Amino acid sequence: MARIKVHELREKSKSDLQNQLKELKAELALLRVAKVTGGAPNKLSKIKVVRKSIAQVLTVSSQKQKSALREAYKNKKLLPLDLRPKKTRAIRRRLTKHQASLKTEREKKKEMYFPIRKYAIKV
């Protein structure tokens, strides 16, 4: 089997990807048997290509699944953890801009009764 082009995989449906994955895994099993029984050298070198193809199929299928989930949760209030942006732990726990801008009643009164003085310089 020749190397698979990823752009061709992206056009396939989910069921086609699953079928291709089964075929590739079956082929890999045959190649491993050939390796143990002392098969031809060209079969041994084919193992790497098949393993890479399996990885490509799995990657494309997981990317499709994740993009479908992103579409499903697009306008929802809460997102699953794996769809949220990956930030540092400290940034995730930081106050939101709204929370940081809130002021206590006492602070509001102090600002209202004692505003910052503005001075104009006479020329």
Curated annotation (Swiss-Prot):
GO terms for biological process: maturation of LSU-rRNA from tricistronic rRNA transcript (SSU-rRNA, 5.8S rRNA, LSU-rRNA); translation. GO terms for cellular component: cytosol; cytosolic large ribosomal subunit; nucleolus; plasmodesma. One of its GO terms (molecular function) is mRNA binding. The keyword Lipoprotein does not apply. Keywords: Ribonucleoprotein, Ribosomal protein. It holds the Pfam family Ribosomal_L29. Belongs to the universal ribosomal protein uL29 family. HAMAP family: Ribosomal_uL29. This is Large ribosomal subunit protein uL29z. It comes from Arabidopsis thaliana.
